[in-house]
């Protein structure tokens, strides 16, 4: 028998906690025998004194096991359970294509996603722009769609990882969100509760990233790779660039349009293509569907070119209550804003730098993101045709189009976009889309 205050004292004194002590504390979080004050004190002790990898693995697995852990064995699936998670960015629409692409290659993708908060968009908000799509199906429907379509993208259900829900809300209110140990456990407990065989982790770097520096992004990527593999799920982290909007747009309906256009081949943003292929190929290799990245890319390009990925996306949408002809007729179903107009820079030159976070906040100001949980979104607003770094900008070439519901909202977003996209005299050096892979063998 342990005492919560003694566990807190040990961590306060920078001692190493045993797996049993961590399990006891997490059980207390879940069943309310540990108080809010004790959880806050524990979080602060971890924030200042950190955890070693064994402690992080114990915390992650205890939180994962605090609720239901999905088990897919009874469905007799003929492929691996694979998934991707992103630390979040602006114009990060990858999940919408990656899930169907991986499923079209023989994987099964039960993707449990989140909503947007702050400057980053949320995958579920994008799906909420699709009429009828149910992001909170019951377990039976979720399993049915995973089995029949190969992919289902839904929200976190109440019985998954209850310990994280309580712990995270307290961390948010007590300034302990930024701990790498606690971030690792929060992200992975939710992902691993989906019963995954393999996971590709997208850790963003740059002005639109969650972590403020490259070094901290790399530290988080290493922690996630070590802990996930230690917890029994094959995992690789990719460090990817978020110094500019990833897709050509940012918002909800606008990103769904770009995702469908990507899958049908109508338009594929080259940066979005590179990061999507990198993550998806890694999922196929980790899941044993392909023996190396080159083979995985051949398979992925084939399911894009033959329309199978787009067909599976359509099957998922209709399976979860959306229109059966969504892929063919998405413009009929997705909302449009009252005003769609270009923004021009004040001078000619090259797009030399981008404050991606500020562009994300411009979408929030338009009504396409949340200032606080529970805010109601306008799915029609956002940015589209956003220029890329290195593009030549002049009086004929806008830096973006703004989708707004009023002149006032347009003017506010226009000022924010002009401030966030810097125009210089010289073309900047090209930055890579993927900085590096961190595999288990790299640790």
From Swiss-Prot:
Stored InterPro entries: Glycosyl_Trfase_fam3, Glycosyl_Trfase_fam3_N_dom, Glycosyl_Trfase_fam3_N_dom_sf, Nuc_phospho_transferase, PYNP-like_C_sf, PYNP_C, Pyrmidine_PPas_bac/euk, Pyrmidine_PPase_CS
Keyword Glycosyltransferase assigned: yes
UniProt keyword list: Glycosyltransferase, Transferase
EC number: 2.4.2.4
Pfam hit, one: PYNP_C
GO molecular function ontology, one term from the record: thymidine phosphorylase activity
Any one GO biological process: pyrimidine nucleobase metabolic process
Entry-linked PROSITE patterns: THYMID_PHOSPHORYLASE (PS00647)
Pathway: Pyrimidine metabolism; dTMP biosynthesis via salvage pathway; dTMP from thymine: step 1/2
GO cellular component terms attached to this protein's record: cytosol
Catalytic reaction equation(s): thymidine + phosphate = 2-deoxy-alpha-D-ribose 1-phosphate + thymine
Family stated for the protein in its record: Belongs to the thymidine/pyrimidine-nucleoside phosphorylase family.
Function: The enzymes which catalyze the reversible phosphorolysis of pyrimidine nucleosides are involved in the degradation of these compounds and in their utilization as carbon and energy sources, or in the rescue of pyrimidine bases for nucleotide synthesis.
Quaternary data: Homodimer.
Name used for this protein in its record: Thymidine phosphorylase
